[in-house]
UniProtKB/Swiss-Prot annotation:
Subcellular localization, as worded in the UniProt entry: Cytoplasm
Protein's UniProt name: 3-hydroxyacyl-[acyl-carrier-protein] dehydratase FabZ
Catalytic activity: a (3R)-hydroxyacyl-[ACP] = a (2E)-enoyl-[ACP] + H2O
Pfam families: FabA
GO CC aspect terms: cytoplasm; membrane
Family named by the database record: Belongs to the thioester dehydratase family. FabZ subfamily.
EC main group: lyase
EC numbers on record: 4.2.1.59
An individual GO BP term: fatty acid biosynthetic process
Keywords recorded for this protein, A-Z: Cytoplasm, Lipid A biosynthesis, Lipid biosynthesis, Lipid metabolism, Lyase
UniProt organism field: Helicobacter pylori (strain J99 / ATCC 700824) (Campylobacter pylori J99)
C-alpha cells in the first residue's frame, strides 16, 4: 500500500542506512542522511578518504574519485528517499524491495573530488508515480557543485 510518510525523522546514521539500502562495501556510497523530507528532498554525504580502494588505480599519484561513483551515490541517496517516502523507515519491507536505475540524464562533472572531501548529495523529487521515481540534483563539496544529474528509478520486488 502506497502512503506518505511525512513524519519521518530527518537524519539517519549508517546503521539505519544499512537496514534500508542493500549495498555493502565497496559499493555503499552513503555515510549519513542529514536532511530528509518525504516526497520532496534529501541531503546525504559520503566522506572521501585516501583509503578508498578505487584510488589504487584512479589515478596513481593523482587520486580523483570517479564520476560514475558520484552518480551512483546520488542514485543510492535517491533510492533511500523514494523508499522511505513510500514505507517510512521499515527494515522488514526493505528486505523485500530493490531500487533499479532506469535512466541517467543531464550528467555534468564540474570539479574533481579528491581524498579529504565530504561529498554531499542534494536531491529533490522531480516527479513520481507509483513505483517510478525521478529525482534530480547536485553533488557538492564545500558548497560548490562538483556534479549534477537527473535519475529515474523503479522500486521492484526482490526475487
Amino acid at each position: 500500500m502506497e502512503q506518505s510518510h511525512q513524519n519521518l525523522q530527518s537524519q539517519f546514521f549508517i546503521e539505519h542506512i544499512l537496514q534500508i539500502l542493500p549495498h555493502r562495501y565497496p559499493m555503499l556510497l552513503v555515510d549519513r542522511i542529514i536532511e530528509l523530507q518525504a516526497n520532496q528532498k534529501i541531503v546525504a554525504y559520503k566522506n572521501i578518504t585516501f583509503n578508498e580502494d578505487v584510488f589504487n588505480g584512479h589515478f596513481p599519484n593523482k587520486p580523483i574519485f570517479p564520476g560514475v561513483l558520484i552518480v551512483e551515490g546520488m542514485a543510492q541517496t535517491g533510492g533511500f528517499l523514494a523508499f522511505t517516502s513510500l514505507w517510512g523507515f521499515d527494515p522488514e519491507i526493505a528486505k523485500t524491495k530493490i531500487v533499479y536505475f532506469m535512466t541517467i540524464d543531464k550528467v555534468k562533472f564540474r570539479i574533481p573530488v579528491t581524498p579529504g572531501d565530504r561529498l554531499e548529495y542534494h536531491l529533490e523529487v522531480l516527479k513520481h508515480k507509483g513505483m517510478i521515481w525521478q529525482v534530480g540534483g547536485t553533488a557538492q563539496v564545500d558548497g560548490k557543485v562538483v556534479a549534477e544529474a537527473e535519475l529515474k528509478a523503479m522500486i521492484a520486488e526482490r526475487e
